[in-house]
Amino acid sequence: MKIKSFLLIILFFIISKIHISFADEAKMTKGFEIFNETAACAACHVLKAAGSEGNIGPNLDTVAGLNYDSVMDIVTHGLGVMPAFGEDEILTKEEIDIVSFYVANSAGK
């Protein structure tokens, strides 16, 4: 009985991991679309994973300390000449979350 319970717990964790990776993959795909089309980040930024070659904003592949929280803050509130996509209601909170996840997991890759 203990072995059966143990195997069920292991199976549950394996299935949970698979579901999480599918969710992350879907989020990355949607993030790519937002980066390249909806928000047009690619027009200004270099990001190898997105195939973008913008030359106005910083190269996101070389920015030190780029993580989800920092990207989320910059996209929401803007920085320098970059618009505040959240404050100006250019993107929804969900879109900002998705594109921030995408950039944080793509930069430097």
Where are these predicted regions, by residue range?
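His/Cys-centered metal/cofactor-coordination and adjacent catalytic loops
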Residues: F22, E37, G54
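Sequence/structural segment immediately N-terminal to covalent heme-attachment motifs in c-type
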Residues: E25-K48
